[in-house]
Every structure is written in C-alpha cells, then in structure tokens.
Amino acid sequence: MALEEARVAFDEDEVPIGAVIVSLSKGVIARAHNQREGLKDPTAHAEMIAITQAAGSMQSWRLEDCVLYVTLEPCPMCAGAVVLAQMPMVVYGALNAKAGACDTLYRIPADPRLNHRAQIVGGVLADRCGAILTEFFAAKRELGER
C-alpha cells in the first residue's frame, strides 16, 4: 500500500514517498503520499500527513498501537513526529542517505534521551522503494529540473 501511495505521488509530480499507518486494533487507518509541491507546504511529507490522519481516526495524538510503514527512511521531522505520537514501530523501505533519521544519519526514534522510543525495521522492499525514487529523479534530471 505504501508503494501504491508512492506511485500516486510520482503521478502528481511529487517526490514518490508513500506511507501507511496500521493500528493493531483497527487495521489500516491512514494512507498518504508526499504533497509538498501541491500544498506548497514543506511539512507535507507522507509520514506527517498519515500521522495526522491516524490521530483523527484514533481520536488521540497517542498512536501507541500503530505501526508506520513508509517507503523511505524518515527525515528528522518525521522521526520526531513518530516519537511525539508515541508510535512503537517504524518499518521503512529504502535508506535515506541525505536525511535519514532512523538509521542513516541519526537514530532519533531510538535515542534513549527522549521520552519515547520506537523499534525500527529498515530495508523492507528496499529495491522497489528505491527504484521509484531513482526513476523519478532520473526523469527530473533529464528534464533539467531539480
């Protein structure tokens, strides 16, 4: 499902990242993709939109029984939101060499100095998650964009 959301982002000329949140008690409660360009909002990452949807669905900012699935390792903003939402787990696809905040550059959700920690599982369908990003940015370079 997260890859389907990434494809929607790709088709909307957004960086193709998709996110899904699953509640252990309710099932899938949120699906989102990047919308920074369309919304003209630097915080409109797939994870942030999905967390907002999930909080609405759960009627709580505490997402203690929810797992975030995302196609790219979350950035510092999104990793911080996971901590603030008290989510127990993040499952991501491709590593984020430029802004990864779960494994690559930082380990925000695992930082013992914070009031909450989340388990991180990385590399799930990494090849497929990375391929859509590679395809998107190759097309942008070919067009002389970004």
Regions found by a protein language model. Give the residues of each.
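Short, basic and Ser/Thr-rich N-terminal targeting/leader segments
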Residues: D13-I17, E64
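Glycine-rich oxoanion-binding loops at beta->alpha junctions
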Residues: M48-Q53, V121
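Zinc-dependent deaminase
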Residues: M1-A9, V28, P74-R146
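Short beta->alpha transition motifs characteristic of CBS
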Residues: I29-R36
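Immediate flanking context of iron-sulfur cluster ligation sites
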Residues: S60-L72
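Short beta-strand scaffold segments in enzyme catalytic cores
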Residues: I17-K26
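Small-residue (primarily alanine) positions within well-ordered alpha-helices
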Residues: A2, A6-A9, A19, A30, ...
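A short, polar/charged loop-to-alpha-helix boundary motif
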Residues: G38-M48
